[in-house]
């Protein structure tokens, strides 16, 4: 599996997006009174925006991540179609938007103080009649791309999706599908189909637990001739299922502001990673991290490689065990701009026991992320004696990094972490035991810079020294 310490590079990805293209319009303003004509709010519109939606939003996400993308879809000979085409040009997205004698699909949302009051849809139920218009541009674009995404919103543009998938597979292309409806047989031959829980339930029926979901999903994909499902499960994360195996990835904890278009971001990121040569598990991790970012934005949104890199940073730190100061400072700058609370503690953590685990869980609960600074081996020897530490720095860091409560582990060679604390400048500094706040290294700096210092009680009955003595005693008896 890929290491995640470097910025993801997707510029080699050549992706063809085919599907239901839409224009999302947002009108926002203040709603401070009720209409005298009917019991409805009156909104004084102050701002109007237009963004790409549906398959066009998938293309926007790919372009934002640095991939090369080409869009095939339908638009009407109208203002909305012209706006959508202009958005594609502004973002250097190649397109073959075929003009049909029907209106461009448009979603108009009226909002006040970020709350959606109403959505008005402008569309027809006859787009299937125009689906043949995409055949020629699809045939021309297919040889120039490595992967094809079919973005199905059930509007009719993908009326002939089965034939298009067969054509793409015959050409040796990756095929990903964001599905709609209850007939997954239409997607026969696809490499990965990405239903959410509601979409999967509509096809396989109700399931009470993860095990049943996986069993039903597996039976469905085998029957439909699909290689794999990537099931998005909102706050539960996502699950990758094939005929032989499954893999679950928990969601990254983030504040959810708006889930509009999150599925587009997932499939776009997955496609960029696969088309760039990453393995399926790494691509899934990228997609999961991307979703955690985009749900914190209003409306259909995209993310940049830098945002994705920051979202992946905690996982990279976990994988390495130790993180260096410059990387940590970069990540903390990003988090503090988001208003996150950074907690820091320190210690030798030579032999991790239940008392340590409880202490670190309590420390993490004080904020959004926890940094654990640990003494180097030489520093431990100076503090504890020549026979310590029992475990090397790398071993201690790896064990700490494996804890759910710990976000980053960093080392310091000095006898105290005062300089490191000043460099990190946490919002909350935590120590355990009977320490007086004034005696805690770095406490004065933290308080002078607007932070706070907390002393947490250790759990009775646990001690590294006591644990070592008991081990040596038992060893001598043996």
Curated annotation (Swiss-Prot):
**Biological function:** Catalyzes the ADP transfer from ATP to D-glycero-beta-D-manno-heptose 1-phosphate, yielding ADP-D-glycero-beta-D-manno-heptose.
Q: What class of enzyme is it?
A: transferase
UniProt region (Cytidylyltransferase), positions on chain: 344-478
Pathway where this protein functions: Nucleotide-sugar biosynthesis; ADP-L-glycero-beta-D-manno-heptose biosynthesis; ADP-L-glycero-beta-D-manno-heptose from D-glycero-beta-D-manno-heptose 7-phosphate: step 1/4; Nucleotide-sugar biosynthesis; ADP-L-glycero-beta-D-manno-heptose biosynthesis; ADP-L-glycero-beta-D-manno-heptose from D-glycero-beta-D-manno-heptose 7-phosphate: step 3/4
Report the transmembrane regions from the record: none
Binding-site residues, ATP: 196-199
Q: Output the superkingdom of the source species.
A: Bacteria
- Keyword Nucleotidyltransferase in record: yes
List the GO terms this entry assigns under cellular component, sorted alphabetically.
cytosol
One Gene Ontology molecular-function label = phosphotransferase activity, alcohol group as acceptor
Subunit field text: Homodimer.
Species name = Dichelobacter nodosus (strain VCS1703A)
- Its name, as the record gives it, is Bifunctional protein HldE
| UniProt keywords, alphabetically | ATP-binding, Carbohydrate metabolism, Kinase, Multifunctional enzyme, Nucleotide-binding, Nucleotidyltransferase, Transferase
Q: Which NCBIfam families match?
A: cyt_tran_rel, PRK11316.1, rfaE_dom_I, rfaE_dom_II
The Swiss-Prot or TrEMBL record describes its family as follows: In the N-terminal section; belongs to the carbohydrate kinase PfkB family.
Q: What residue spans carry the region label Ribokinase?
A: 1-319
For this protein, what reaction is catalysed? D-glycero-beta-D-manno-heptose 7-phosphate + ATP = D-glycero-beta-D-manno-heptose 1,7-bisphosphate + ADP + H(+); D-glycero-beta-D-manno-heptose 1-phosphate + ATP + H(+) = ADP-D-glycero-beta-D-manno-heptose + diphosphate
Q: Name one GO biological process term.
A: ADP-L-glycero-beta-D-manno-heptose biosynthetic process
- Active-site residues, as the UniProt record annotates them: 264
Enzyme Commission (EC) number: 2.7.1.167, 2.7.7.70
By its UniProt entry, which Pfam families does this protein fall under? CTP_transf_like, PfkB
């Amino acid at each position: 599996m890929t290491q995640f310490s470097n910025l993801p590079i997707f510029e080699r990805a050549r992706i063809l997006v085919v599907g239901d293209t839409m224009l999302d319009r947002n009108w926002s303003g203040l709603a401070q009174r009720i209409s005298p004509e009917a019991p409805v709010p009156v909104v004084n519109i102050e701002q109007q925006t237009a963004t790409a939606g549906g398959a066009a939003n998938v293309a926007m996400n790919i372009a934002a991540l640095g991939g090369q993308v080409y869009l095939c879809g339908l638009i009407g000979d109208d203002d909305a179609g012209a706006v959508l085409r202009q958005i594609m040009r502004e973002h250097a997205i190649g397109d073959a938007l075929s003009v049909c004698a029907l209106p461009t699909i448009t979603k108009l949302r009226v909002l006040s103080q970020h709350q959606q009051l109403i959505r008005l849809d402008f569309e027809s139920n006859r787009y299937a009649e125009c689906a043949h218009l995409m055949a020629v541009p699809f045939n021309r674009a297919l040889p120039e791309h490595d992967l094809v995404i079919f973005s199905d919103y059930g509007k009719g543009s993908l009326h002939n999706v089965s034939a298009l998938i067969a054509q793409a597979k015959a050409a040796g292309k990756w095929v990903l599908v964001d599905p709609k409806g209850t007939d997954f047989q239409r997607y026969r031959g696809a490499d990965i189909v990405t239903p959410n829980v509601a979409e999967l339930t509509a096809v396989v029926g109700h399931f009470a637990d993860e095990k049943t979901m996986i069993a039903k999903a597996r039976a469905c994909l085998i029957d439909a001739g699909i290689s794999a499902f990537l099931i998005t499960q909102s706050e539960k994360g996502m699950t990758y299922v094939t005929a032989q195996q499954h893999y679950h990835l928990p969601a990254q904890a983030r504040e959810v502001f708006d889930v509009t278009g999150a599925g587009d971001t997932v499939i776009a990121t997955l496609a960029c990673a696969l088309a760039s040569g990453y393995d399926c598990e790494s691509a899934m991790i990228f997609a999961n991290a991307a979703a955690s970012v985009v749900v914190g934005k209003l409306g259909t949104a995209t993310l940049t490689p830098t945002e994705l890199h920051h979202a992946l940073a905690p996982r990279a730190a976990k994988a390495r065990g130790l993180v260096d100061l410059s990387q940590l400072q970069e990540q903390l700058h990003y988090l503090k701009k988001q208003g996150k609370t950074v907690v820091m503690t320190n210690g030798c953590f030579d032999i991790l026991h239940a008392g340590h685990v409880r202490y670190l869980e309590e420390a993490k609960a004080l904020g959004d992320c926890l940094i654990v600074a640990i003494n180097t081996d030489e520093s431990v020897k100076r503090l504890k004696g020549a026979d310590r530490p029992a475990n090397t720095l790398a071993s201690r860091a790896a064990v700490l990094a494996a804890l759910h409560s710990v976000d980053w582990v960093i080392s310091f060679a000095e006898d105290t972490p005062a300089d490191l604390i000043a460099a990190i400048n946490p919002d909350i500094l935590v120590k355990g035991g009977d320490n007086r706040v004034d005696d805690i290294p770095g406490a004065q700096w933290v308080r002078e810079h607007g932070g706070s210092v907390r002393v947490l009680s250790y759990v009775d009955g646990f001690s590294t020294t006591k644990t070592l003595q008991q081990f040596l005693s038992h060893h001598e008896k043996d």
